[in-house]
Amino acid sequence: MRIILLGAPGAGKGTQAQFIMDKFGIPQISTGDMLRAAIIKAGTEMGKQAKSVIDAGQLVSDEIILGLVKERIAQEDCAKGFLLDGFPRTIPQADGLKENGVSIDYVLEFDVADEVIVERMSGRRAHLPSGRTYHVTFNPSKVEGQDDVTGEPLVIREDDKPETVLARLGVYHEQTAPLIAYYTKEAEAGKTEYLKFDGTKLVAEVSAEIEKVLS
């Protein structure tokens, strides 16, 4: 079961990724984690290449990232499948997977309108010292603007400010709209299965739908 997840930041992808991993016993493969591991260990040839590029402050090429992905999915814990999150981000990367013989069984897209995502994310409030988070609509603190435990002020993290969220959504649409078209076409050709979920539904509802189609 080889799965790619597509969805804007704040669309609930991370929550459903965790559900799929727990339910089906497959690992999540994050290119960010792989690059961090390459920096620490640099155990393989690809890892060494990635480390030297990162140390030089340069962007890691698709070729190196694809090499790291191939190495990672050859490991024992990926025998039953894996979940790719945050990769591929571009058409050349999607082509690269195909050229490297990595077939994908399911592409899952989590669809949520931009204005809903902005409301979800800009409503978040954080108590930075403890890491406790709240939401003005969905999970409010007992006293507005104050942490429940300490009474200290809550803040809006930089990442959750509406202008930051909108900028991230702009990047997502620019990069991912072509991928949606790409994998829809692959599905029409019978090479993968493309499934779209309404990310505005309750988490448990979306999880139940995913379980049904993947079982």
From Swiss-Prot:
BP term (GO), one: AMP salvage
Gene Ontology molecular function terms on file: adenylate kinase activity; ATP binding
Q: Which SUPFAM superfamilies match?
A: P-loop containing nucleoside triphosphate hydrolases
Entry's Gene Ontology cellular component terms: cytoplasm
Write the Enzyme Commission number(s) for this entry.
Answer: 2.7.4.3
Respond yes or no to whether keyword Transmembrane is given for this record: no
Q: Which InterPro entries match?
A: Adenyl_kin_sub (IPR006259), Adenylat/UMP-CMP_kin (IPR000850), Adenylat_kinase_CS (IPR033690), Adenylate_kinase_lid-dom (IPR007862), P-loop_NTPase (IPR027417)
Recite the UniProt keywords alphabetically.
Answer: ATP-binding, Cytoplasm, Kinase, Nucleotide biosynthesis, Nucleotide-binding, Transferase
Which sites bind AMP? 31, 36, 58-60, 86-89, 93, 157, 168
> So, what pathway does this thing act in?
Purine metabolism; AMP biosynthesis via salvage pathway; AMP from ADP: step 1/1
Per UniProt, ATP binds at 10-15, 124, 133-134, 201
For the region NMP, give the residue spans.
30-60
The reaction(s) catalysed by this protein are: AMP + ATP = 2 ADP
Q: Which HAMAP family match?
A: Adenylate_kinase_Adk
Subunit comment = Monomer.
Which family does the record claim for this protein? Belongs to the adenylate kinase family.
Q: Tell me the function of this protein.
A: Catalyzes the reversible transfer of the terminal phosphate group between ATP and AMP. Plays an important role in cellular energy homeostasis and in adenine nucleotide metabolism.
Protein name, entry field:
Adenylate kinase
Species assigned in the record: Aliivibrio salmonicida (strain LFI1238) (Vibrio salmonicida (strain LFI1238))
Where is the organism placed in the taxonomic lineage, from the top? Bacteria, Pseudomonadati, Pseudomonadota, Gammaproteobacteria, Vibrionales
